[in-house]
Amino acid sequence: MQQVLQEPLIHWALRSFLAALFATAALSKLTGMEEFHGVVRNFRLLPDMASRAVAMVLPVAELAVAAGLMIPALAAPAALAAAALLGVFGLAIAVNVLRGRTQIDCGCFRNGMKQRISWAMVARNAVLTAMALGAAALLPAARPGGTADLATGMLAGSVLFLLYFSASMLGGLPARHPSTASVKGR
């Protein structure tokens, strides 16, 4: 097991997945700043002025984390920053679920798809936080890797991200109700 945890391919896959997650989230927020400000404000955790500041700074911080994860010298602190951000996001979601405000959008990706918050989303963030903490903890033990490890790890991380993002997109689709479903083909 120890050899698996030291495998550079594992580290690059984990870092690439997290970097893609943060870069995509940041870029989607930067393209819809006003909408994202509304999402932050809708969580009702900060005063309006602070909500605007957070909405402006958060995508930049997410881009910095994404870049840091891909730079070996910065990967460990970037992974810790990723864990901190994911933990705060999970806490903000949990507070609103406890308040019964599950109809609000999480604001994870500003792709036109609304993702209502839930305990499942809190659990998802806990898993992502654990992944980021794992990346930070395992980095010092990683064996040096070659170009093949880097390329394969980045490809694996990208595929994992595409699967994750696809599942998120599908989760944001409105449910079809039997009463509104098409009867085509019958």
UniProtKB/Swiss-Prot annotation:
Task: Please list which residues make up the signal peptide.
Answer: none
Q: Which Pfam families match?
A: MauE (PF07291)
Tell me which InterPro entries the record gives: Methylamine_util_MauE
Q: Is Transmembrane among the key words of this record?
A: yes
GO CC annotation? plasma membrane
Per the record, the pathway is: One-carbon metabolism; methylamine degradation
User: Keywords for this entry?
Assistant: Cell membrane, Membrane, Transmembrane, Transmembrane helix
Tell me if Transmembrane is a UniProt keyword of this record.
Answer: yes
Protein location: Cell membrane
TM spans, by residue? 8-28, 54-74, 75-95, 119-139, 153-173
Entry's Gene Ontology BP terms = methylamine metabolic process
Superkingdom in the source lineage: Bacteria
- Protein's UniProt name: Methylamine utilization protein MauE
Record organism: Paracoccus versutus (Thiobacillus versutus)
Lineage of origin = Bacteria, Pseudomonadati, Pseudomonadota, Alphaproteobacteria, Rhodobacterales
